[in-house]
Amino acid sequence: MRHIICHGGVITEEMAASLLDQLIEEVLADNLPPPSHFEPPTLHELYDLDVTAPEDPNEEAVSQIFPDSVMLAVQEGIDLLTFPPAPGSPEPPHLSRQPEQPEQRALGPVSMPNLVPEVIDLTCHEAGFPPSDDEDEEGEEFVLDYVEHPGHGCRSCHYHRRNTGDPDIMCSLCYMRTCGMFVYSPVSEPEPEPEPEPEPARPTRRPKMAPAILRRPTSPVSRECNSSTDSCDSGPSNTPPEIHPVVPLCPIKPVAVRVGGRRQAVECIEDLLNEPGQPLDLSCKRPRP
């Protein structure tokens, strides 16, 4: 870019326009992106952001200017009005405050104690829970083992042999591999099947019979003779009527009577005050006059 010397310190309008055109052509011509509509970043663009910044070449210099002692003094609330020691002074990895040391370095109105390294013991010396009696009694736990030769060198078989005392016993896996059979636990007894509920009895229909007829009672003057005994009975019959299979001619049929709830018919009101001589018959109605 060429240098333009302005005489008198005045830049005209034509000179300013030429300077801007020259700036655009020489500086921004190659890196100028094409104009485009602004679009917000997508979720993938926000998720794939690269937050790993390159190493700062000034990080070491800044760390020397502001050592750990200054940062610790700021945390402790100590005002430092002067600069810390010159760069290059080594700082220990861990600093602790020891006010009992009389030697102090004046950094301003408020003195800051000297910081010396201290080894911190991070070992936990607290006693844990005491072991319970159950853990001692359990001993070795059962572990299912798979060996090349079933029953030889198997930890599962050794566990069962040690607990049972039988030297020839094998675990279920070795027994299955040797005999080709599975080991099943004892089968429990089958549950009793519920008894089927009895079906409700259906009402049986009675066989149809010939209609029963009532025999007309004999009058006081009639006489009936029994052919089997050759005896005759006189007077009204007190026995129930007999049932005959043959229907006689002109039988007496009962007539349905409607029961009424009206009071007894009286001639005058005084009849209601007197006690009735016979029970009130409500089966029939007296016809109206």
UniProtKB/Swiss-Prot annotation:
Highest taxon in the source lineage: Viruses
Pfam families linked: Adeno_E1A
Residue positions of motif Bipartite nuclear localization signal: 258-289
GO BP annotations listed: positive regulation of cell population proliferation; positive regulation of protein sumoylation; regulation by virus of viral protein levels in host cell; regulation of DNA-templated transcription; regulation of protein localization; symbiont-mediated perturbation of host cell cycle G1/S transition checkpoint; symbiont-mediated perturbation of host ubiquitin-like protein modification; symbiont-mediated suppression of host gene expression
Keyword Cytoplasm on entry: no
Modified residues (Phosphoserine): S89, S219, S231
Region (Disordered): 82-107, 186-240
Consequence of changing L122I: Abolishes binding to UBE2I
Motif (LXCXE motif, interaction with host RB1 and TMEM173/STING): 122-126
Subcellular location: Host nucleus
InterPro entries: Aden_E1A
UniProt keywords, alphabetically: Activator, Early protein, Eukaryotic host gene expression shutoff by virus, Eukaryotic host transcription shutoff by virus, G1/S host cell cycle checkpoint dysregulation by virus, Host gene expression shutoff by virus, Host nucleus, Host-virus interaction, Inhibition of eukaryotic host transcription initiation by virus, Inhibition of host innate immune response by virus, Inhibition of host interferon signaling pathway by virus, Inhibition of host STAT1 by virus, Interferon antiviral system evasion, Metal-binding, Modulation of host cell cycle by virus, Modulation of host E3 ubiquitin ligases by virus, Modulation of host ubiquitin pathway by virus, Oncogene, Phosphoprotein, Transcription, Transcription regulation, Viral immunoevasion, Zinc, Zinc-finger
Subunit organization: Interacts with host UBE2I; this interaction interferes with polySUMOylation. Interacts with host RB1; this interaction induces the aberrant dissociation of RB1-E2F1 complex thereby disrupting the activity of RB1 and activating E2F1-regulated genes. Interacts with host ATF7; the interaction enhances ATF7-mediated viral transactivation activity which requires the zinc binding domains of both proteins.
Entry protein name: Early E1A protein
Organism: Human adenovirus C serotype 5 (HAdV-5)
Species lineage: Viruses, Varidnaviria, Bamfordvirae, Preplasmiviricota, Tectiliviricetes
